[in-house]
Design a protein with these regions (language model features):
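Active-site-facing substrate-recognition patch
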Residues: 1-52
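Conserved acidic residues
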Residues: 53, 121, 151
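Gly/Ser/Thr-rich loops at beta-strand to alpha-helix junctions
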Residues: 59-65, 132
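A short helix->loop->beta-strand "cap" motif at the edges of active sites that frequently abuts
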Residues: 74-76, 147-148
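Short, glycine/charge-rich flexible loops or terminal/linker lids adjacent to PRPP-binding catalytic cores
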Residues: 75-123
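PRPP-dependent phosphoribosyltransferase catalytic core
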Residues: 137-185
Length: 185
């Protein structure tokens, strides 16, 4: 397996290069289980974060990051858009999403109780990686339907075309790769 070496929030990491299809590979960024990286990324993102009332992310890879950001910032509450409706939800908002790391359409669900808390509040959208923007768009739709105001969009890494977006903040750029592991220009 080939790897892409990069420094993220001052820490060196090796990302395995994984095929998406016969023409595209990605550097697999997995924050799960990497406590030092999670802490460092949260700290660096908070340095550039706009003023917000609540954070939101999509299940699953943004969870450790948003939790650590909330902990460091002293936030008592953050929101999680789930991949499935849960029995404990009092009602749900539902939007469809298709991202580069998933092979099929998925849905994101937000509990009505959380949506009520978002009304009129400044919501900061956070994720581990922004690539095609589909997951981000789904989160935006959830926040808007809940009556929240999006005050910013942040990620640890901006992948591919996301690097050219002016409406997101991120720590590092992550290129896309050819099937042989070379960087796409």
């Amino acid at each position: 397996m080939k790897y892409y070496e990069m420094t993220i929030a001052g820490l060196k990491r090796s990302l395995p290069i994984c095929p998406v299809n016969d023409k595209l590979s990605i550097g697999a960024f997995v924050i799960f289980g990497d406590a030092p990286l999670t802490v460092a990324c949260a700290k660096e993102l908070l340095k550039i974060a706009p003023t917000y009332d609540y954070l939101i992310t999509a299940e699953a890879k943004g969870i450790p990051l948003i939790h650590e950001m909330a902990r460091q910032h002293g936030d008592a509450k953050y929101f999680l858009a789930r991949k499935g409706a849960k029995l404990y939800m009092t009602g749900v908002f539902d939007v469809a999403v298709h991202s580069i790391s998933t092979a099929k359409e998925q849905h994101l669900y937000l509990d009505t109780a959380d949506a009520e808390m978002m009304k009129g509040k400044r919501i900061l959208i956070v994720d581990d990686v922004i690539s095609t923007g589909e997951s981000l768009h789904a989160l935006e739709k959830l926040v808007e339907e809940a009556g929240g105001t999006i005050c910013g969009r942040m990620a640890i890494l901006a992948e591919g075309d996301a690097q050219g977006r002016t409406d997101i903040q991120y720590l590092e750029k992550l290129p896309l790769f050819h099937p042989d592991g070379t960087v796409m220009e």
